[in-house]
Amino acid sequence: MARYFVDSNLVVYANDRRDPEKQARALEVLTQLMTAGNGVLSIQVLQEYANTALAKLEQEPQVVIRQIKLLDCLTTIAPSPASVRRTVEVRNTYRISFWDAAIVVAAEAGECDIILSEDLNAGQYY
């Protein structure tokens, strides 16, 4: 079964009522991944979601905490010194931002086949 890495924009859209169409699609994708058990995210994704939800979506802290708890069923990848070194390598090889490279490295660690992100080039292999 394919494994999918979830970037923070998908989690943000699932919690953003300002665009009901994007929200519905993001909720559909997250629900499928949660049900199938083939979703992966990273600590960075959780941090980016929490920051955006609190600052831009103006969600209450308890709502953000509850949403993060719901994501516990996805595999979570934590950074390590080795992953930071690998992030620097990926950044330099593919000429992408450090933070996008960190997503690529976390997806590698989670043995993901596909990264669900609007920040990276569609169809790009890393």
Please provide the spans of the model-predicted regions.
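Acidic, metal-binding active-site segment of PIN/NYN-like and related structure-specific nucleases
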Residues: 101-126
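Beta-rich strand-turn-strand
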Residues: 95-97
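Short, well-structured N-terminal submotif of metal-dependent ribonuclease cores
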Residues: 1-41, 55-63
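Acidic catalytic patch
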Residues: 18, 43-47, 69-93
